[in-house]
Amino acid sequence: MSKTEKNALDLLKGAYNLSTPDDNKKYYQGFAPFYDSVFVKDLGYTYPNVVANLLVKKFNLDGPICDIGCGTGLVADEIKKKAPNAVIDGVDISQDMIQISREKNLYRSLLELNLEDSLDPLSKDYSA
């Protein structure tokens, strides 16, 4: 295992030790700048592609999609490859992850939200 892969795995293990929303915010604040390169490039992260394939197969994507825990937009990127006209709103607890998503221009809207708080901002009709 390369040093980069070991560092990435150590970071991933840290995610399993998070217990509060503030822990999550702090963790992803530091991880956001290299999240995509670590998971996608270094570790061959395929989860976003798997999720996008399931969404396209199981749901009508004519209506808006809510990407909860959108992070840096990896899932939205895969959805757009399969359904280019999909309308996606993203929600994440980390402003740093949202900022990276915003730069990719994949979402209709992005919202920083702790899912333990009120979900009123999500009271839209989503198809998925």
Where on the chain are the PLM-derived regions?
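Short secondary-structure boundary/capping elements
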Residues: 19-20, 47, 93
